[in-house]
């Protein structure tokens, strides 16, 4: 099960069509709007569907609390959990009682979870045919091993920065592609810090020996 989560956090979005773009705002303006959204968003909850390169579909609920906290609560039969505590991302596989952990800054998700990150240095607006859609590709050219993330936003009055995150695609250095689609997004909802706690399966495994 590890491989399904690894591509998501160690790493051209189907949410937008690769057709000729209509007249749109400048790339700098687009990056500014996205940065404003990420800085304005205190919390977000959503349902998600995740598809990997092999076509396997997993679903669950996503919770974000800025800065840096995130939780992917997968469907029960997946036995998988991904949690970010503000500093590190942890992938817990309850099926095999394994845990992996690494800095958020080493993941494509840093673009989403670090609202102070300068997108003008790492981001590039990807043209779309819909003027209400913004797509940004974020990568660190000095750290290709961190992968690439392409996020898609749509205009939504009343949302933070008047934008709504619709999903993203992450691509790691081994070309493993993971697509996330979001629905039922809610902003500014109360989220306790305990939401980002998790149970270490290795303790239970050791106690059985």
Spell out what each predicted region is.
Residues 1-9:
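Bacterial N-terminal signal peptides that target proteins for export
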Residues 36-54:
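A short, Trp-centered hydrophobic/proline-enriched beta-strand micro-motif
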Residues 41-43, 57-59, 65-67, 77, ...:
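Extracytoplasmic
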Residues 18-20:
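N-terminal signal peptide c-region/cleavage motif recognized by signal peptidases
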Residues 23-42:
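Short N-terminal segments immediately surrounding and downstream of signal-peptide cleavage
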Residues 61-113, 178:
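An acidic-aromatic
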Residues 52-54, 95, 174:
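Solvent-exposed strand-loop boundary residues in beta-sheet-rich modules
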Residues 120-122, 127-209:
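Gly/Pro-enriched, hydrophobic low-complexity segments
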